[in-house]
A protein has these predicted regions:
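Active-site-adjacent segment of FAD-dependent monooxygenases/related oxidoreductases
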Residues: 1-42, 46, 57, 134
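Conserved FAD-binding catalytic core of PHBH/FMO-like flavoproteins
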Residues: 37-186
């Protein structure tokens, strides 16, 4: 953990080993697409049938079954609700609308490819499988390696100033630079 200026505030050596020891499983940073692909591939190996391009109309947890907008009903052993922020599956299970709750944070996301980085110090930083946090006034940042150290994900969090009802908007690079002026250059 770093102060926004770069000063190290705390460090946990062997974080991944400690996680494995404590939980009996590894700590892994994955790109969401890689996780989705791994789950999809394994499910196919186990014989799961996928029906793509269907909208869920209803989920009956007692069945369990799923009924789509086109009227098809699918009986299942298990229904996995992984349909995102505005989840219809969650709404069906709860029996009521469950809109996302604002966190007060707005996230700028940046993914860098190691091949794009020329600075040797930054290349070494990115290639290490470590998670870094920076804490600053009214903002914080998280950075970690992806794809075996070939990519680096950075999430910059600032107070949310989007209008009500707007969940996503193109970022403004100049605004972001201003918000993080004086921060650790790494």
């Amino acid at each position: 953990m770093h102060q926004y200026s770069g000063t190290v505030l705390a460090r946990e050596p062997d974080f991944d080993k400690n996680i494995r020891r404590k939980y009996g499983a590894p700590f892994v940073d994955l790109h969401r697409v890689d996780l989705q692909r791994a789950l999809y591939d394994r499910a196919q190996e186990l014989g799961v049938k996928f029906q793509l391009d269907e909208r869920v109309e209803n989920v009956d947890p007692a069945g369990p079954s799923v009924t789509t907008k086109s009227g098809h009903k699918y009986d299942a052993d298990l229904v996995v609700g992984a349909d995102g922020l505005w989840s219809r599956t969650r709404q069906c299970f709860l029996g009521t609308a469950d809109e996302p709750k604002p966190t007060g944070d707005l996230a700028y996301r940046i993914v860098l490819s190691l091949s794009q980085i020329e600075d040797p110090v930054l290349r070494l930083w990115i290639s290490k499988p470590e998670v870094h946090f920076w804490i600053g006034p009214r903002s914080h940042a998280v950075g970690y390696s992806l794809k075996g150290g070939n990519m680096y994900n950075i999430v910059l969090l600032v107070p949310d100033d989007l209008p009500p009802g707007v969940a996503k908007e193109s970022g403004n690079v100049e605004e972001m630079k201003k918000l993080f002026e004086g921060w650790d250059p790494v």
